[in-house]
Amino acid sequence: MATPANQTGRITQVIGAVVDVQFEGHLPAILNAIETKNGDNRLVLEVAQHLGESTVRTIAMDTTEGLVRGQEVTDTGAPISVPVGAGTLGRIMNVIGEPVDEQGPIKSEGLRAIHQEAPAYTDQSTEAEILVTGIKVVDLLAPYAKGGKIGLFGGAGVGKTVLIQELINNVARAHGGYSVFAGVGERTREGNDLYHEFIESGVNKKGGGEGSKCALVYGQMNEPPGARARVGLTGLTVAEHFRDQGQDVLFFVDNIFRFTQAGSEVSALLGRIPSAVGYQPTLATDMGALQERITTTTKGSITSVQAIYVPADDLTDPAPATSFAHLDATTVLNRAISEKGIYPAVDPLDSTSRMLSASIVGEEHYNTARMVQQILQKYKSLQDIIAILGMDELSEEDKLTVARARKIERFLSQPFFVAEVFTGSPGKFVDLADTIKGFRAICEGKYDHLPEAAFYMVGTIEEAVEKGKKLAAEAA
């Protein structure tokens, strides 16, 4: 129920990002946006609690330095609303929909509230179709669903952002529809780089407008927790509008953990008693409210790729553990694999996908994937024996398994387009058929004669054969 707009109140206390406002008469509804001036800037506060004595407790969407008690605040009578539509493409906006790219105002098709109901069961679509990414380890072992939810899990510095940028490069460029990128509590430098890369690669035009394909919504690390807790919803609102117009939208979020982290900062300031590991007691509810809206309906689809930081590499931490339940495919990045120099450092045994079923991907793909996992699992179980007794104590059959597993491990690596700058090797996009063919041949022993090094950082199996010849020539 929207309250009458233009009601005024006065600030009674400011504690960091939380501001208490006293109203006379009607109280603004929970989640309403109320506005005040902070210097020359418009400061938006979102109502979080009704405290009694005509006072509401609000969360600020920007810094509160400079606010004073007794300052006047106006109720807008509605939740935070942001511009949506084609005018947002090629532009960067913040949590409240203001442009931050210095390219003038956003020409929008109207405003849409950032708090929406999730689509009803009857409106949701359940078709299963594979989204080919061109990344071998993903396409083979944990394939992504079109219109599905994908999570990239990893600790600090194992390559989540590089992987998300490669997916943007491979999928968004080839993709005819629109994309939305929500930068939630990540590095401003990365956001800036991404903006310029999009312009250089032709995904976006400077200043937006005709020909731009991706809308950017940023609430980075330097923003107060209120903005970081809501910027994911702002990005999602832009994506939902495109979906409801019948588009197939790609929605990238980097990083969902920061959304949870911001919620936990705000929760403590709101006086809630923390739950496990100090997270907010409403962790599952907050995550559900965001994730249930990211869905494919009969009108259009949203395929979302979400980077999820794993604190201290512990997948059982409540923040990553809560996100697991919502995803169709999980790509787990492993520090032990990145330490071997194998990139992308995707764990082939820990990553899962509901799409990896013979009825969806076909018998050949399914059997090849399972064969690869079987060999890698056998190698994993032999590692203790190798560490204690050495390779010589293994049976001939086990030695062969180990040799093939090490080749598979290296063949799961691949040079990325977005990493060309710092690796010096050109990126590779590998078709699904080539990926299946290559791994099947390794499992069947057709390339037992090639050295391990031939499989490292190549695209297709033909490139590995070429590299093997080159290595043999150099050794001769």
Curated annotation (Swiss-Prot):
Residues that span the membrane, as ranges: none
Gene label: atpD
Reactions catalysed: ATP + H2O + 4 H(+)(in) = ADP + phosphate + 5 H(+)(out)
Coiled-coil boundaries: none
Record's keyword terms, sorted: ATP synthesis, ATP-binding, Cell inner membrane, Cell membrane, CF(1), Hydrogen ion transport, Ion transport, Membrane, Nucleotide-binding, Translocase, Transport
A Pfam short name: ATP-synt_ab_N
InterPro entries (UniProt xref): AAA+_ATPase, ATP-synt_VA_C, ATP_synth_F1_bsu, ATPase_a/bsu_AS, ATPase_alpha/beta_chains, ATPase_F1/V1/A1_a/bsu_N, ATPase_F1/V1/A1_a/bsu_N_sf, ATPase_F1/V1/A1_a/bsu_nucl-bd
Primary location group: membrane
Subunit structure comment from the entry: F-type ATPases have 2 components, CF(1) - the catalytic core - and CF(0) - the membrane proton channel. CF(1) has five subunits: alpha(3), beta(3), gamma(1), delta(1), epsilon(1). CF(0) has four main subunits: a(1), b(1), b'(1) and c(9-12).
Disulfide partners: none
Subcellular location, record wording: Cell inner membrane
Gene Ontology molecular function terms on file: ATP binding; ATP hydrolysis activity; proton-transporting ATP synthase activity, rotational mechanism
Top-rank EC class of the record's enzyme: translocase
GO cellular component: plasma membrane; proton-transporting ATP synthase complex
Membrane topology: Peripheral membrane protein
EC number(s) from the headed UniProt entry: 7.1.2.2
Reported function: Produces ATP from ADP in the presence of a proton gradient across the membrane. The catalytic sites are hosted primarily by the beta subunits.
Listed name of the protein: ATP synthase subunit beta
Family the UniProt entry places it in: Belongs to the ATPase alpha/beta chains family.
Binding sites annotated in the UniProt record for ATP: G154, G155, A156, G157, V158, G159, K160, T161
